[in-house]
């Protein structure tokens, strides 16, 4: 008799991450983690993304023993400086003016845990922004309202029009959940999307 696969939980309130995970056709539940996302003094952007992804996964795993939990976080950087979520129109406009014509790194970190063992990954995406006029920025912000998105650019929707190019080993990383790496990680926890068996 085949073993029953563990319950899968996505520690996220993001509908985009839910949509991405659903592509793998594994049944899952989404639970919003309660985690303080304040950066630590001097913390590197990649370290911040990894720390928060682990914290989110562990926060949910602590109350759901026997489950496999996915935590994720994304941090954007320009010239090594982190670019957070803007929170409102004026800050988003400032961010996009700064990013106009520039190369931006997006660190898409993930943690997968069963509460005992934890695996992590950080997939880097390099985005080159078009040179943006104020009119283009304002039109985008009015249409998209990307105030809860690192760097104010939602590549999964109209934000793709802000880009000149995107380079990554995983095309889903820019949206916040790198499915190629995640598939490998889940297989090691007994959740292979193709076979249902450990990879």
From Swiss-Prot:
- Kindly list the cofactors needed: a divalent metal cation
Q: Where is this site: Important for substrate specificity?
A: 16, 74, 156
Q: Where is the active site?
A: 73 (proton acceptor)
Q: Which Pfam families match?
A: Maf (PF02545)
Compartments annotated for it: namely: Cytoplasm
A GO molecular function annotation here is: nucleoside triphosphate diphosphatase activity
Q: Which EC number(s) does the record attach to this protein?
A: 3.6.1.-
Q: Which InterPro entries match?
A: ITPase-like_fam, Maf-like
Its UniProt entry gives the catalysed reaction(s) as: N(7)-methyl-GTP + H2O = N(7)-methyl-GMP + diphosphate + H(+)
Print the keywords alphabetically.
Answer: Cytoplasm, Hydrolase, Nucleotide metabolism
Enzyme class name? hydrolase
Which cellular component appears as one GO term in the record?
Answer: cytoplasm
The UniProt entry's GO biological process terms, in alphabetical order, are: nucleotide metabolic process
Q: What is its main location?
A: cytoplasm
Spell out the family assignment given in the record's similarity comment.
Belongs to the Maf family. YceF subfamily.
Task: Quote the function comment for this protein.
Answer: Nucleoside triphosphate pyrophosphatase that hydrolyzes 7-methyl-GTP (m(7)GTP). May have a dual role in cell division arrest and in preventing the incorporation of modified nucleotides into cellular nucleic acids.
The UniProt entry, under HAMAP family, shows: Maf
Recorded protein name is 7-methyl-GTP pyrophosphatase
